[in-house]
């Protein structure tokens, strides 16, 4: 049976009002609890670049902002048997979704979504766990589009490939990059990265075999030489003209695959032998997206099934200490601090850090 928990009549949440202004809403509705989910009191949230873009055509007035959360279970749906009240969980939300406007991470209470959540490992803080969800989801989607398998959570060592296979990760000091490089290593691939020199050690700590200064004028040739002109895979975690151009130029003579985290400038995608695609975060739920073109997507059962498999794998890897979190900048101060953190992210004031805000 469902464990009874009475939510307050209202809660506080961060939203965008009818004037397209990010607003702290103190009389926001509380979500209802589906039978196959749990209700969570949010203790910490992490900020992502996508949070700062939910304005204009991407905004549903008074829908909740926020993707990444961690918190304490306060109620359990009738069909859930493996979670109890008091357990700690972390997960991702489909923020600013018109179908479920009261489900966003930046709120006092939320309900888990699909199977895109997991229990917080022993020894992890809420802040550490909250930093993972978007990175896990995006890293998994990127590997899928690159055509690379997810790690085997039961393996004691990474598989030995017949010959070294390099994967270029442009923007190797970003939060998504540090997770995907760890996953690539666990799948047997060799990540090489680009970033600023002051973040070289960060990228190497999280799996990069070697790191290159993204500002090097001869970088494409340097990477071609390093990979013996056989680079087949490039993941672009920055996505601008310079990053797309570099990735296409670095891929070897036989061609390969390029994946970015946002729509890439097509005029920079100059080689027919390179297949290009980009990730869209909400597809991890299988729900599709109602955002304007080119971000609109239909729902997909295959996407939903992949999201569940990814999170089953990633939860094990995190639990076993095979994936570690990005360096954090933890900010106290609740919802006002979220607004301040969003400004830090929007204006590009971070390097090698992920902003996490304490709510609890």
Swiss-Prot record:
Pathway it works in: Polyketide biosynthesis; lovastatin biosynthesis
Gene3D superfamilies: Medium-chain alcohol dehydrogenases, catalytic domain (3.90.180.10), NAD(P)-binding Rossmann-like Domain (3.40.50.720)
GO molecular function: nucleotide binding; oxidoreductase activity, acting on NAD(P)H
Annotated binding of substrate, by residue: 134-141, 281-285
Positions contributing to NADP(+) binding: 50-53, 173-176, 196-199, 214, 261-262, 279, 350-351
Domain of life, source organism: Eukaryota
Expression induction: Expression is controlled by the monacolin K cluster transcription regulator mokH.
Free-text biotechnology note from the record: Monacoline K acts as an inhibitor of HMG-CoA reductase involved in cholesterogenesis. Its hypocholesterolemic activity might be useful for lowering cholesterol levels in the blood and reduce artherosclerosis and coronary heart disease.
EC class of the enzyme, as a word: oxidoreductase
PANTHER family, A to Z: HYPOTHETICAL OXIDOREDUCTASE (EUROFUNG) (PTHR45348), ZINC-TYPE ALCOHOL DEHYDROGENASE-LIKE PROTEIN C2E1P3.01 (PTHR45348:SF2)
Family: Belongs to the zinc-containing alcohol dehydrogenase family.
Protein function: Dehydrogenase; part of the gene cluster that mediates the biosynthesis of monakolin K, also known as lovastatin, and which acts as a potent competitive inhibitor of HMG-CoA reductase. Monakolin K biosynthesis is performed in two stages. The first stage is catalyzed by the nonaketide synthase mokA, which belongs to type I polyketide synthases and catalyzes the iterative nine-step formation of the polyketide.
Assembly and binders: Monomer.
Protein name as it appears in the record: Dehydrogenase mokE
Organism: Monascus pilosus
């Amino acid at each position: 049976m469902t464990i009874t928990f009475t939510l307050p009549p209202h809660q506080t949440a961060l939203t965008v009002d009818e004037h397209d202004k990010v607003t702290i809403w103190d009389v926001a509705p509380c979500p209802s609890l589906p039978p196959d989910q749990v209700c969570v009191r949010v203790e910490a949230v992490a900020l992502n670049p996508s949070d700062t873009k939910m304005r204009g055509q991407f905004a549903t007035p008074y829908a909740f902002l926020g993707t990444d959360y961690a918190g304490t279970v306060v109620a359990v749906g009738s069909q859930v048997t493996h979670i109890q009240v008091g357990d700690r969980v972390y997960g991702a939300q489909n923020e600013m979704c018109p179908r479920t406007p009261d489900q966003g991470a930046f709120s006092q209470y939320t309900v888990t979504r699909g199977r895109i959540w997991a229990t917080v490992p022993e020894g992890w803080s809420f802040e550490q766990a909250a930093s993972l969800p978007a990175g896990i989801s995006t890293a998994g989607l990127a590997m899928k589009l690159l055509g690379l398998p997810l790690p085997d959570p039961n393996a004691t060592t990474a598989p030995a490939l017949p010959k070294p296979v390099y994967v270029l990760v442009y923007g190797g000091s970003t939060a998504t990059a540090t997770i995907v490089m760890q996953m690539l290593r666990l799948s047997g691939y060799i990540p090489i990265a680009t970033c600023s020199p002051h973040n070289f050690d960060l990228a190497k700590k999280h799996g990069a075999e070697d790191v290159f200064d993204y500002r090097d004028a001869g970088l494409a040739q340097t990477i071609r030489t390093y990979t013996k002109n056989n680079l087949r895979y490039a993941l672009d975690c920055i996505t601008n003209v310079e990053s797309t151009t570099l990735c296409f130029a670095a891929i070897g003579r036989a061609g390969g695959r390029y994946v970015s985290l946002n729509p890439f400038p097509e005029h920079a995608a100059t080689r027919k032998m390179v297949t290009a695609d980009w990730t869209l975060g909400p597809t991890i739920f299988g729900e599709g997206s109602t955002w304007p073109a080119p971000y609109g997507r239909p729902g997909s059962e295959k996407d939903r099934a992949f999201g569940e498999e990814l999170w089953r794998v990633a939860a094990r890897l995190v639990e076993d200490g095979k994936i570690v979190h990005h360096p954090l900048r933890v900010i106290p101060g609740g919802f006002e601090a979220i607004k301040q953190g969003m400004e830090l992210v929007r204006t590009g004031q971070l390097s090698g850090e992920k902003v996490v805000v304490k709510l609890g």
